[in-house]
Amino acid sequence: MSIKHTAVSYYGLNYVEHAVKDFEEMKEHGCDTVILAITEFDMDFWFPSINNIVKSAHNLGLRVIADPWGIGKYFGGEQVSLFLQNNVHHRQVSAYTGEVLNAACFNTNSFRDYFRNICMKLARDTEVD
């Protein structure tokens, strides 16, 4: 099986002008895809920038994949989770110790809905590939 795409994961969706410079460097190194790691914070505070960054990547010929990163701390990441702050009773519980953990429980409808809404908003309101 041959490698069809070369990608770089990209964090920090705040400023389009910085992203463009980074994307140009990615292209110089042979990358054709950028994976945008999108956090809860990005969705809440930087959402208007996300699609502008997607468009700038497309203008440079890059394929764009959205990666919901650190959402509820369920999907990794050290970012602050607004879901966890607002839903303290919907956290994972250790099967061994009963300790409440600092990660959302995917078995709760509230977290599933929260995560699905983020994914749907990215699919509906951006031009990610």
Q: What is each of the regions a protein language model found here?
A:
Residues 16-28, 47, 51, 55, ...:
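Amphipathic, non-transmembrane alpha-helical secondary structure
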Residues 22-26, 35-88:
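Aromatic-lined substrate-binding rim segments of carbohydrate-active enzymes
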Residues 1-2, 29-31, 94-99:
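Generic detector of short, locally flexible boundary/turn motifs and exposed helical patches
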Residues 6-14, 35-44, 97-117:
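The substrate-binding groove and active-site-proximal loops of carbohydrate-active enzymes
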Residues 54, 66-126:
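Active-site-adjacent "subsite" loops/lids of carbohydrate-active enzymes
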Residues 2-9, 15-20, 61:
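Substrate-binding groove of N-acetylhexosamine-processing glycoside hydrolases
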Residues 4-10, 34-36, 64-68, 129:
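Hydrophobic faces of well-ordered beta-strands that scaffold small-molecule active sites
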